[in-house]
């Protein structure tokens, strides 16, 4: 069986969700052993960091359509599928089909049914903390410190990945640490 970008993403998410691994450590290790193309590696990175970042929102979406708690592996797979459908802009047929392909024979029908429902229904969020996948206390703190519109805008902005820059020596850093590059020439890339 050939390795797919989603199978690598699922392997990383399983390590993160079930073994307590850190995404920034497990993902590079898995990618270094894979034979994926650069675009596929970027897609894996988006899936892993995005699914991890939006975990609470993905769980709220899944919980809307399941009657009993799925096993841990199935929950992780459903999160991956829900992230693709709701947040990553992946075409529904592609997200559902590719995610179901990763399911076990026993769970494939269940995963297919849940993700098809997710793909056709507009989510009604209980609150901004769930929609933006933050703990309640963070959302409450922001809403207590600024206007509701400013709080939501700040929380939304913090969910946007920082642009990445590469120095000519190959060092990669996010834009928030650009002050480090003040003494070393950097190119946006």
Residue ranges and their predicted role:
Residues 1-169:
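Class I Rossmann-like S-adenosyl-L-methionine
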Residues 167-189:
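Rossmann-like S-adenosyl-L-methionine
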């Amino acid at each position: 069986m050939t390795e797919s970008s989603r199978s690598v993403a699922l392997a990383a998410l399983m390590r993160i969700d079930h073994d307590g691994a850190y995404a920034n450590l497990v993902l590079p290790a898995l990618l270094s052993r894979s034979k994926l193309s650069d675009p596929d590696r970027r897609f894996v990175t988006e899936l892993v960091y995005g699914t991890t970042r939006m975990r609470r929102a993905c769980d709220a979406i899944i919980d809307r359509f399941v009657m009993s708690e799925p096993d841990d592996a199935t929950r992780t797979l459903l999160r991956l599928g829900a992230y693709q459908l709701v947040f990553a802009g992946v075409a529904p047929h592609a997200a559902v089909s590719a995610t179901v392909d990763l399911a076990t024979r026993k769970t494939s029908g269940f995963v297919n049914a849940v993700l098809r429902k997710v793909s056709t229904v507009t989510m009604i969020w209980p609150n901004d903390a769930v929609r933006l996948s933050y703990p309640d206390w963070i959302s409450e703190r922001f809403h207590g410190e600024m206007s509701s519109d400013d709080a939501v805008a700040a929380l939304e902005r913090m969910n946007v990945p920082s642009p990445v820059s590469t120095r000519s020596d190959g060092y990669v850093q996010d834009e928030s640490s650009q002050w480090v590059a003040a003494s070393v020439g950097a190119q946006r890339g």
